[in-house]
Amino acid sequence: QHSPVEPELRLIPHPVLWKKESGTCDLSHGFCLPQTPPAEIQKLIHAFSSLINRYAFKDTLSSAGVTIHFENLQQKVKDEAYELEIKEESVSIRASAYNGFFYALISLLQLKESGDGIIPCGRIEDSPRFSWRGQHLDCARHYYEVDSILRLLDLMSFLKLNRFHWHLIDDEAFRLELSSVPELAARTGMRGHGCTIPGVFGGSKGPTGGTYSAEDVSRIIEHASSLGISVMPEIEIPAHSLALLKVIPEMRDPEDKSFEVSVQGYSENTIN
């Protein structure tokens, strides 16, 4: 059970354990991360610093700020667990893996931003209640630019979400560019008048859509990894396969004379 919410501790989600102590820590001038960190912390600091800079959080990272100490607990706690000890002059972060250290920094950022830089001293022990904390995005029915997806991943990281469920294939499009079957994305990535896929779900005013190259996918996966997020690409078959069958109709049994209509109004959109 999580401890009851206290007004002076504004964290989402609320930690498993919060033990308040006397005094406050002044983070109004930011906090100072190690300049020569151990190898396992270096990637973390780069990812967190980049995240801070992308959203222009003022007075967050400063050599004049409160010193942050990192301690690796060497598998003594779960990978996503962390301990945060807040003193008046310093903050200690303890964890066993990348995600734990990252979530501790996110918690510290939340506390700083919600408390105008002044946060209570105390000890936080936290670990996720759920191993899968996900966000789903349907890019088959509506195409999202890569930069929009990267921004979504950033926002997920602020809430300590760790799974990106990426829906890429459906009746309306086959978004992945495959070198083995390039015509799949080339013919179904755009929909509208005169296209292989008709104008539905916002595609009626003209061809709309797009595809994701191997480079796009690699960029998204790498960005997600730096934020402690795993990517789960979803390719939907054998149902919801209209786009696939428009390009490779032989994947449907020609002897099958059944006529089914999906909820969305598509017929003969299953592989059999």
Placement of each model-derived feature along the sequence:
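Acidic, contiguous N-terminal accessory segments
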Residues: 1-133
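Feature activates predominantly on carbohydrate-active enzymes
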Residues: 75-268, 272
